[in-house]
Amino acid sequence: MNKRVFSLPINPKLSEEFVINTFLPFLHEYRDYILDLYFTCRIPPFDQDAMGDCYSDNIALIESAIYISNQSDIPLSATFNNIWVRPDQKNLDLWIKEFAPIYNSGVRVVTLPHTTWVSSGQIQAAFPELFIKNTILREVTKPSEIVSLAEAGFNYINLDRDLMRDRDQLLRIRKAKDYCAYLGKPVMISMLVNETCWGGCPIMPEHYQYNSTRTKDDPIFYASPISRVSCSTWDVEHPEFDLKQANLPPWRDDWVEMQELGIDTFKLHGLSLIHI
């Protein structure tokens, strides 16, 4: 069984001292268990994403992530997960133009939100070594979606976190994954395991829409008036709060069981704006 099972985030707000003295030593020690490092990548038309933060120097963020990847010898994954960016030809052409320098810097893994773009084959033609992930925001839950995404050209599929407690559906998805391999379209399957959000959260899509359309003049979601009806208060109002979190328990047996159910990678959350 593959040991490289974790996809880890690079927090864009890490200080240089922390990166050098703490983060890189950690990555060196555990690199045999880490598949890749993903980071929020801000290039047109993706000026914002589901992480929801605003930065003054997007180029510096990219350069910092590339530095960490090079120093740790762990592949870098650029994340473009804003599903509210219009999926038209103009934006596809623009993204290919803007991503080219990053690809030429050695980045070979991306998360992309639009199946139409991947289906066009234009991205693969421009970047033949690119490994393409879908975004968890597309809420993939069905075996048929696995096959469709593999046929479209995705190499790696993030499942909806709610499947964590649906063993029967995971077994069906494992069969779909095997079928993709039979078709000559093998895919890796990933599960986000520690975001602490409720399974079936009724406002999660709206939270991510808020983040993905936020500007520097807007407060973060949890500082906005509308958050009064969000999970910012649920831990106090609902005694069952912890039991509803779609988190994988810390016990090793549970993680091994997920692998046996077809999960290749455990994604650890990288949301910049965590409610504290």
Model-found features: residue ranges?
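Active-site pocket-lining/capping segments in soluble small-molecule metabolic enzymes
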Residues: N2-E145, F154-I274
